[in-house]
């Protein structure tokens, strides 16, 4: 992630939006791991967003915020909009587009290489990198799908 953000010149306090964050994965973990990140976790379920706020307060994380909202209501620009288990790639990019900064990136954690989902993306969304990952203790395929708006 840091490599992709650095390529955009976003080493200093990049703004991340974790869509459908639920209990804070991966948003809260990223906020803990890198205090320079400004992480906002948005969820349509109020108690989930409230939990993120409680985590931020309990762990004294000024760089973590929980928001009770629908992602399509988000208009503040974010350098990286990410999701772990939110929607198809097409729905994820469509619903979160208003929250993406002009040079921003989307990042989605998926299971198997999502060839059909990639093929269903609108022409203005470009997949520029798919990174296979392994999760210790989990015998399953996972990958990170990096996307951006075409220039």
How should each PLM-predicted stretch be described?
Residues 56-57, 97-99, 122-123:
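Short, solvent-exposed amphipathic alpha-helical segments in soluble enzyme
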Residues 38, 63-65, 105, 126-129:
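Conserved beta-strand segments of alpha/beta enzyme cores
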Residues 103-113:
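Conserved beta-strand signature within the Rossmann-like core of class I S-adenosyl-L-methionine
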Residues 112-151:
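Active-site capping/gating segments
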């Amino acid at each position: 992630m840091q490599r992709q953000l650095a390529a955009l010149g976003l080493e200093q306090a990049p703004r991340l939006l974790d869509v459908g964050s639920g209990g804070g994965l991966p948003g809260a973990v990223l906020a803990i791991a890198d205090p320079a990140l400004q992480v906002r976790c948005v969820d349509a379920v109020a108690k989930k967003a409230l939990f993120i706020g409680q985590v931020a307060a309990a762990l004294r994380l000024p760089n973590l915020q929980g928001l009770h909202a629908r992602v399509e209501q988000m208009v503040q620009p974010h350098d990286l909009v990410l999701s772990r288990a939110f929607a198809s790639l097409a729905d994820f990019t469509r619903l979160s587009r208003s929250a993406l900064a002009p040079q921003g990136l989307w990042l989605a954690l998926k299971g198997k290489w999502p060839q059909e989902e990639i093929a269903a993306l609108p022409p203005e969304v470009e997949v520029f990198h798919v990174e296979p990952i392994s999760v210790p203790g989990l015998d399953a395929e996972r990958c990170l799908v990096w996307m951006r708006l075409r220039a």
